[in-house]
Curated annotation (Swiss-Prot):
Reported modifications of this chain: N-glycosylated.
EC id: 3.1.1.5
Database matches in InterPro entries: Acyl_Trfase/lysoPLipase (IPR016035), LysoPLipase_cat_dom (IPR002642)
Function: Exhibits phospholipase B (PLB), lysophospholipase (LPL) and lysophospholipase/transacylase (LPTA) activities.
One cellular component (GO) term of this entry: extracellular region
Organism: Cryptococcus neoformans var. neoformans serotype D (strain B-3501A) (Filobasidiella neoformans)
Predominant location category: secreted
Enzyme class (EC, first level): hydrolase
Annotated ranges, domain PLA2c: 46-572
Protein name, as recorded: Phospholipase B
Signal peptide segment: 1-19
GO molecular function: lysophospholipase activity; phospholipase A2 activity
Length: 637
């Protein structure tokens, strides 16, 4: 009997006074689900003979991704033509490759990022009226990290429904992620049943598994939530979700980073750590290593968990390791701390389960996700992970690259423009200050030293420069005249209509609060329909590279846009004052440049909150988030 099983059995005995037996014992559950191929646990399959188990990153795009992007382009092209015509702009001579990147930051990031996405959806009446709705149909790639990965997984698995529709009909984010309002026992016993089944097969199980299943039970389609059959794998999405099967949605990418152990035993999450990608087709990285970079590699994600040695399976193959909930949990291991806080609190069902995990793993392994190393003994001369049993992954936001730009910056993907949604907790009052972009730029300089591991990141100002220049309060274009890089359209969160600077650790939101978060995120992209020229300038930035424009041949309209919205290269590095934007206000830069028609003339404004400083909301948000977390921990069963 495993240590997890023993602890769980003891905790059940301690709670029988008010507990009821699990509704479905493990044996019955397996019978219900055939041979286990529909549960969270991986299942054994015959090893295929026609699979390329390792693909070197220097070979370009994988076949699955290439086919998807080719199919996507057929839908993207007419969508972009329509959006350009609506602005009176010329159709690009080639179809631009556009990406969106959603930052991390818990539910705050999920809601703010999906709000920004909603600002690009023609299904949103307000976005359509703001004349930015419809651009999502022109996007080829979508990357998400941590809370942004929850947005990615939920949006994609639900077929691209309007986020406000998901909030109304599916999400149960008003119930705490760790401490649900009701059904606690069934929730925790289901967590045990599913994770123990995976452990029984010899696969590593960690708090990430519990955390991922909890996330999935709040935002994934109901048939795949913990109370039903939590068996939705990332690789199955194109088969299960029609909108992904026919390439009607951008190709999703979820990001994590690796953690290394130095010789002295110190655990390290370096800013130049390896960035790992999960897509419906592959798992891998474009560049391996930290201090020394070498070309990376990819393996079919469908067979992740299979023991592979130098590119060949060791006789037994598996499917089902790539559960979407697990991938989302892996991208957000920072939140394992929500469960770690249970250690040492009042005895309870989940407390004993977590304690068992810690005893089995060691506390230095509690905030990680372990992936069986498919690249064992592959390219051992250059591959720095060739001798590892597991790839150890953490929340990529812990590298300070809190916007997952890197997958969209690799030369192979030929991305022309990236809409970067930033809801990071950078400042004292939980607003972004450009740290994510600056960190990626500094990392790009390191990668540039190695020809096969480059990322094409334009220069951006320092964090102080972001704040002093007001770039963290309104959209800014970066890389405008550096034609070797994509144009980055930076969309920072701003309190257009709501105090969206809530705590990263706020683990539940009332529906009306979540709705306001979505709307505010949308208005950070649409500028609350207060800048008449913005829809045209947004279109210019998204398509600029496909015209091969420079300042010498850009259209008059688009050059005027770039003169207005592009970073001019200034970088005021002096220490700025605390950034404290006012709720329901217009960013001062828009007013100073006579761009805004004023909030009173814009739709959707909420005048009742005008003049409220966001600092109070931030303090209250942090307090409420931590109170909700610690109170729930104290009241555990």
């Amino acid at each position: 009997m495993s240590i997890i099983t023993t602890a769980f059995a003891l905790s059940l005995l301690a709670t029988t006074a008010f507990a009821v037996p699990p509704e479905t014992p493990r044996i019955e559950l397996q019978a219900e689900r055939g041979l286990g191929d529909q549960s969270y646990a991986p299942w054994q399959v015959d090893c295929p003979s026609n699979v390329t188990w390792i693909r070197n990153a220097t070979t370009g795009l994988g076949t699955g991704e290439r086919a998807y992007i080719e199919a996507r382009e057929k839908l993207v092209q007419p969508a972009i033509e329509q959006m350009m015509a609506a602005r009176g702009l010329e159709t690009p001579p080639r179809t631009p490759v556009i990406g969106v990147a959603l930052a991390g930051g818990g539910y705050r990031a999920m809601l703010t990022g999906l709000g920004g996405i909603m600002g690009m959806m023609n299904e949103s009446t307000e976005a359509s009226q703001s004349e930015t709705g419809g651009w999502l149909d022109g996007v080829s790639y979508w990357s998400g990290l941590s809370g942004g990965s929850w947005a990615t997984g939920s949006f994609m698995s639900n077929g691209g429904q309007l986020p406000t529709t998901l909030l109304e009909n599916l999400w149960n984010i008003d119930s705490n992620l760790v401490f649900p309002d009701d059904g606690k026992l069934s929730f925790y016993t289901n967590l045990y049943t599913e994770t123990n089944a995976k452990s029984d097969l010899g696969f590593p199980v960690q708090i990430t598994d519990i955390w991922g299943l909890a996330i999935g039970s709040h935002v994934l389609p109901e048939p795949y939530q913990l109370s039903n059959t939590p068996n939705l794998t990332f690789s199955s999405l194109p088969s299960v979700v029609a909108a992904l099967g026919n390439a009607s949605l951008p190709m999703p990418i979820i990001v994590a980073a690796d953690r290394k152990r130095r010789e002295a035993g110190e655990l390290v999450i370096a800013e130049n750590a390896t960035v790992w990608e999960f897509t419906p087709y592959e798992f891998g990285s474009w560049a391996f290593g930290s201090q020394y970079k070498s070309p990376g590699a990819f393996t079919p994600i469908e067979y992740l968990g299979t023991s592979v040695d130098d590119g060949s399976p060791n006789g037994t193959c598996w499917k089902g390791f790539d559960q979407l909930s697990f991938v989302m949990g892996t991208s957000a291991t920072l939140f394992n701390g929500a469960f770690l806080e249970l250690n040492g609190t009042d005895s309870g069902l989940l407390t004993n389960l977590i304690t068992a995990f810690l005893a089995d793993l060691g506390e230095d392994q509690a905030d990680i996700s372990r992936i069986p190393n498919s690249f064992s003994n592959y390219n051992s001369g250059e591959n720095p992970i060739y001798n590892l049993t597991y790839i150890t992954l953490v929340d990529a936001g812990e590298t300070n690259q809190n916007i997952p730009l890197e997958p969209l910056l690799v030369p192979t993907r030929d991305v022309d423009a990236i809409v970067a949604f930033d809801s990071s907790y950078d400042s004292d009052y939980i607003w972004p200050n450009g740290t994510a972009l600056r960190t990626t730029y500094e990392r790009a300089k390191i990668l540039a030293e190695h020809e096969n591991t480059r990322v094409l990141m334009p220069e951006v100002p320092s964090m102080n420069g972001f704040v002093n220049g007001g770039y963290n309060s309104r959209p800014t274009f970066f890389g405008c005249n550096d034609t070797t890089t994509p144009v980055i359209i930076y969309i920072p969160s701003y309190p257009w209509s709501f105090a969206a600077n809530t705590s990263t650790y706020q683990l539940s939101y009332e529906n009306n609060e979540a709705n306001e978060m979505l709307l505010n995120g949308m208005r950070s992209l649409t500028l609350n329909h207060s800048v008449p020229t913005w829809p045209t300038c947004f279109a210019c930035a998204l398509t600029d590279r496909s015209f091969m424009y420079t300042s010498e041949n850009r259209s008059t309209t688009c050059q005027e846009c770039f003169d207005t919205w592009c970073w001019a290269g200034d970088d005021n590095t002096t220490e700025p004052a605390n950034y404290e934007p006012v709720i329901n206000s217009v960013p001062p830069w828009l007013i100073a440049n006579n761009l805004s028609i004023g909030m009173a003339d814009a739709p959707g404004s909420n005048e009742s909150t005008a003049g409220t400083a966001s600092s109070g909301a931030a303090k209250m948000g942090v307090g409420m988030g931590m109170v909700a977390l610690t109170a729930g921990l104290g009241l555990m069963l």
